Design a protein with these regions (language model features):
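Juxtamembrane/disordered regions of integral membrane proteins
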Residues: 1-133
Length: 133
């Protein structure tokens, strides 16, 4: 369970920070000071991300639990990465299906959240041989 919580927290905290930097500095050419002043928006993004990802992370935990002791750590991480990537896309699709057909800032959101969850899967140690979860 700790593995899933680490990935969840990593994704919902790091993704908004990366989004603020990428959207603010690179795309909108904002100053670093104005990016730092948007902490309220980042906080709201963390809360909304937490709430909207609950169903996906429950399924993530169930998949991880199913994979425990049945597959190697490498295979489990590949499966969890694929699910994590797809779960982000599905969640955003439920909110706004139009982001797929048009390139927008929301598409960047999906890419960053997807990559962040995959990075989390591979960064944190997943011990499939744990006795308790």
């Amino acid at each position: 369970m700790r593995y899933v919580i680490k990935i969840w927290l990593f994704t919902i905290i790091v993704s908004p920070l990366l989004l603020a930097l990428i959207l603010g500095a690179i795309i909108n050419d904002s100053s670093f000071k104005s990016i730092l002043n948007s902490y309220e928006i980042i906080f709201v993004m963390i809360i909304v991300g937490f709430l909207s990802s609950i169903p996906a992370m429950v399924i993530f935990w169930l998949i991880k639990r199913f994979l425990k002791n049945k597959y190697s750590t490498l295979t489990a991480k590949i499966i969890l990465s694929i699910y994590g990537f797809l779960s982000v896309w599905i969640t955003f699709f439920i909110v706004d299906s139009g982001f797929i057909t048009r390139w927008s800032e929301q598409t960047i959101w999906v890419l960053i959240y997807s990559l962040t969850i995959v990075i989390g899967v591979w960064t944190f140690k997943n011990n499939n041989k744990e006795i308790t979860e």
